[in-house]
Amino acid sequence: MNVFINAEVYNDLISYSLRRLPEEACGFILGGQDSGNGELQTSTFIPLRNIASNPWNRFEISPVEMLPYLMDSNHPVIGLFHSHPTAPPLPSEQDLQTLWHSIPTYWILSLQQPQRPELQLYQIKKAPQTAYHKLAFVIGQ
């Protein structure tokens, strides 16, 4: 699976994450699938409030805040996004325990070096055991 990220979405998630430092930022990526080549294409980044009791090294999204996006079939959620303020863009043990494996992509932005953010996208599978693999992506106009 390949993902096309438009530049506005990419810039929005970086600027939001930098503003949220030192806490983890989180949100949804909306978009769809190109019927011609099967590539996922982003349309919008939706920042969501991190309500975790310890937002410096974990994230939690309010069910009330996320539900409208999950129920909107006209603008599907194709990605779950969060930042790692002080860690590389690799899924942590906590990330791998996610219940969000039904969302096609899992995005992690590392801000270890805030002047050089590093984004990685993954697909997480739960059965028969939890596994993840990197996804290819292109940042375009």
Residue spans for each PLM region:
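Conserved beta-strand-loop surface patch within small alpha/beta domains used
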Residues: 1-77, 86-141
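Conserved, mostly hydrophobic/aromatic
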Residues: 80
